[in-house]
């Protein structure tokens, strides 16, 4: 089946799973589900590939029937492999076979579960010259979305202009693959690999996965080798360092950032002091929002504390326990709000270190988010009077340059890359905070890198429509090298956390995505798929003749340079391809990392019709003999046509064979 032959606007290709009992001889109680990866297919006929899987397992089970019964998934389209119920003895036998690349136990992976498109510069007006129009709104681009495959009954998904909201590539088509189940939305590695295999066979143009653990999915390597870009979310475990997921170089890993919209609400205290918070609290018809309500201090608002107080009908001030590193404030808000509601409280004022994430007000009562400075003022007022009162007014909307944006979200997972230190991750940041998303029966503000991932997927669809001959590596390069490292006021982007800081490449990769600049990057850092295969074989697969390669992963031609171990001098090579004006000359500009000298040879690159590809060398010299952490800089190639091709530099000086820091 080829999806290109379908005329429907939205295609749903749901995966279904079967729950079954395995009781045949050869599959004993100790058997577990394993993924056996065999690499490229040896046959073009999928049925022959599956037959080869049966043939491989038959000696292990004693009969073909039992071998067939053991297989849960046969990967036969984009690559070769299978998921089967195996015991430890069978696993050892398979692992020793020369044509078996890997045998890994099936794992569960967590799903990383409007105005944002205008903020990104994708103007929907007909006279706009943005990437949206240049890319024909993503027309006929098929996006394979691999996740929980939920059917959302909402007219926004109507394919015939009946929707009430728009996306980034509104004329693209969707192929939805179900690989995740359960209330917590956990995704089976075996099912995810099967979904990738089917997506390749179905002819999708892009694969989007808001799921953790891409290094466990070798199928994505085959997708990219076939010209299919793969977009992953970075994870929601920030701001802790080395928390980023999906760390292989062939995928686009997306961090989350804020947008230029906020919903302030006025909190009026009984002494007439007016303070600002954030909320999506709105006035319910016939409710008396002019009334003041008794205000109490609920501290962390655990159920025990609230039970000891009489909070019935009152508004409670609660604090997020920020003493716990890496705790996501959204979890604690829900916990506190539910406790307040259960104890009879009318509403909640919740204090945390960032107020950009919006939550629905539980029970229809008033709620507001405040930072700790505001909370301390409220707390001081509570203990200054015998009858503290408060009124939370309905929120209103502010958008545009009045709102400082973007900022990297506190929850967005951070680098450095925990698996491959010489590869920068995440790759890019995009809108992922308080995004209006369609749900059953309406809309809801949602936050997460799972919100940021679809933004980049939509932009990739537009780029693929505009430049159908570009490889996945070229598209990724265009996105990263044109990204912005400054906010709407030209000030360096900040990263939220404890404390807030100036963002660096470990927070946002190349920067915050700029779709319109990505349409015309000037130069791209392209990569031969064979180089990805070598990377896989030397890091995740068979490792023959890889000793020198593994120590220099930073030589892969990605649009960034990360060297974790500069002792004295390290030289790195990069190659760029001209996709701009045929006759052009680029000059290099370096912002060196602190404590490092950077030399570029040559510092001029000239292109013409016969010279479209150029290689250059970047040499890093350690100026200080101190065991340190990473410092950051950039290398930019600029021409006379306003092309500015910037890649981030992340360098760590070491004097011993160990690393003093990870951040």
Stretches with model-predicted labels:
Residues 2-663:
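Loop-rich non-cytosolic ectodomains and luminal regions
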């Amino acid at each position: 089946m080829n999806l290109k032959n379908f005329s429907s606007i939205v295609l749903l290709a749901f995966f279904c799973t079967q729950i079954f009992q395995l009781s045949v001889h050869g599959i004993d109680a100790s058997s577990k589900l394993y993924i056996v990866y065999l690499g490229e297919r040896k046959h073009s006929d999928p049925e022959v590939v599956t037959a080869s899987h049966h043939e491989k397992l038959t000696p292990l089970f004693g009969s073909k029937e039992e071998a067939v019964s053991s297989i849960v998934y046969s990967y036969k389209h984009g690559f070769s492999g299978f998921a089967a119920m195996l015991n430890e003895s069978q696993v050892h036998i398979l692992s020793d076979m020369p044509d078996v690349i890997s045998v890994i136990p099936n794992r569960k992976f967590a799903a990383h579960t409007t105005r944002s498109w205008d903020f990104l510069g994708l103007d929907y007006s007909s006279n706009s010259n943005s990437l949206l129009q240049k890319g024909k709104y993503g027309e006929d681009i098929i996006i394979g979305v691999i996740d929980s495959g939920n059917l959302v009954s909402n007219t926004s998904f109507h394919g015939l202009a009946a929707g009430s909201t728009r996306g980034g590539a509104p004329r693209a088509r969707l192929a939805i693959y179900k690989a995740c189940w359960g209330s917590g939305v956990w995704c089976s590695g075996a099912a995810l690999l099967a979904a990738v295999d089917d997506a390749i066979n179905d002819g999708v143009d892009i694969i989007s996965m808001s799921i953790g653990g891409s290094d466990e999915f070798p199928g994505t390597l085959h997708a990219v080798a076939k010209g299919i870009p793969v977009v992953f979310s970075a994870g929601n475990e920030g701001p802790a360092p080395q928390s980023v997921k999906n760390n292989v170089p062939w995928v686009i890993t997306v961090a989350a950032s804020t947008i230029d919209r906020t919903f302030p609400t006025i909190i009026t205290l009984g002494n007439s002091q007016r303070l600002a918070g954030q909320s999506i609290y709105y006035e319910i018809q016939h409710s008396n929002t002019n009334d003041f309500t008794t205000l109490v201090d609920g501290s962390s608002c655990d159920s025990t504390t609230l039970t000891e107080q009489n909070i019935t009908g009152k508004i409670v001030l609660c604090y997020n326990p920020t003493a716990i590193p890496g705790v996501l404030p959204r979890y604690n808000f829900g916990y506190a709000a539910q406790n307040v509601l259960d104890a009879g409280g009318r509403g909640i004022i919740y204090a945390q270190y960032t107020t950009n994430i919006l939550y629905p007000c539980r029970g229809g009562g008033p709620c507001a988010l405040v930072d700790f400075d505001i909370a301390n003022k409220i707390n001081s007022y509570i203990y200054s009077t015998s009858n503290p009162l408060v009124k939370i007014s309905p929120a209103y909307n502010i958008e545009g340059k009045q709102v400082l944006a973007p900022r990297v979200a506190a929850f967005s997972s951070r680098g450095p890359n925990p698996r491959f230190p010489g590869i920068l991750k995440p790759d890019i940041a995009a809108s992922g905070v308080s995004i209006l998303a369609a749900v059953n029966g309406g809309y809801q503000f949602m936050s997460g890198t799972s919100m940021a991932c679809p933004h980049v997927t939509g932009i990739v669809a537009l780029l693929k429509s505009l430049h159908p001959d570009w490889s996945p590596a070229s598209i990724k390069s265009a996105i990263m090298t044109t990204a912005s490292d400054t906010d709407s006021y030209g000030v360096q982007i900040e990263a939220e956390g404890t404390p807030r800081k100036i963002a660096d490449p470990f927070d946002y990769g190349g920067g915050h995505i700029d779709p319109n600049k990505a349409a015309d990057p000037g130069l791209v850092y392209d990569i031969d798929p064979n180089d990805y295969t070598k990377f896989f074989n030397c890091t995740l697969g068979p490792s023959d003749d890889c000793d020198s390669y593994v120590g220099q992963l930073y030589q892969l031609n990605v649009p960034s340079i990360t060297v974790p171990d500069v002792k004295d001098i390290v030289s790195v090579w990069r190659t760029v391809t001209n996709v701009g004006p045929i006759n052009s000359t680029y000059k290099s500009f370096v912002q060196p990392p602190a404590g490092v000298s950077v030399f570029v040879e040559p510092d001029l690159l000239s292109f013409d019709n016969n010279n479209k590809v150029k290689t250059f060398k970047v040499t890093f010299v350690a100026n200080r003999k101190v065991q340190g952490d990473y410092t950051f800089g950039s290398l930019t190639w600029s021409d006379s046509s306003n092309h500015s091709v910037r890649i981030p530099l992340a360098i760590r000086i070491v004097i011993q064979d160990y690393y003093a820091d990870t951040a």
